[in-house]
Amino acid sequence: MSRVGNKAIEVPNAVKVDIKDRNFISVEGPKGKLEYQFNHRLTITNENKVITVKRPNDEIFMKKIHGTTRALLSNMVEGVSKGFQKTLKIVGLAYRAQIKDKQLILSLGFSHPVSVAIPDNLEVVVNQNTEIVIKGIDKQLVGEFAAKNVKLRKPEPYKGKGIRYVGQYVRQKAGKSAKKTRKD
């Protein structure tokens, strides 16, 4: 029994949900519009501003897809009403970020600046050259873009330099200790 899949999704008043062709749903709200094509064997209903997802049987595949579809629909409703945001912090001497022509340009200690194309449906803001705020309506796209940037220079364990999520704990290691000389 999928506990996630059986939960109903409450739809805010500002959000409009449209189910077409038994396997296509579009969710539109104040922040934008998202569309999703789900498995045709699932049944999705939208009654009285409440979305429910039902599966036809208890096959293992259907149980998996049931919970996943419900979670994706919930994220779509939240995304078009409130939106999603991830904040990254750049730590390191002379490490900085800037935006130029829909490109995020990062100076991360390499011999050249690294430029990353910003997707059309994301909004990226750089604060004080060391903080990157990524906003969007698609949770997966926001998380993917943030992870792609963190991967460029992961926080290293000795000084903590690199790109990290705000609030992320980076475990620090002790450096080499000086060699002790022994007197006999």
Curated annotation (Swiss-Prot):
Sorted UniProt keywords: Ribonucleoprotein, Ribosomal protein, RNA-binding, rRNA-binding
Top-rank lineage group of the source organism: Bacteria
One BP term from GO: cytoplasmic translation
GO molecular function, one term: rRNA binding
GO cellular component labels: cytosolic large ribosomal subunit
Family, as annotated: Belongs to the universal ribosomal protein uL6 family.
Entry function: This protein binds to the 23S rRNA, and is important in its secondary structure. It is located near the subunit interface in the base of the L7/L12 stalk, and near the tRNA binding site of the peptidyltransferase center.
Subunit structure: Part of the 50S ribosomal subunit.
Descriptive protein name: Large ribosomal subunit protein uL6
Source organism of this protein record: Onion yellows phytoplasma (strain OY-M)
Protein's gene: rplF
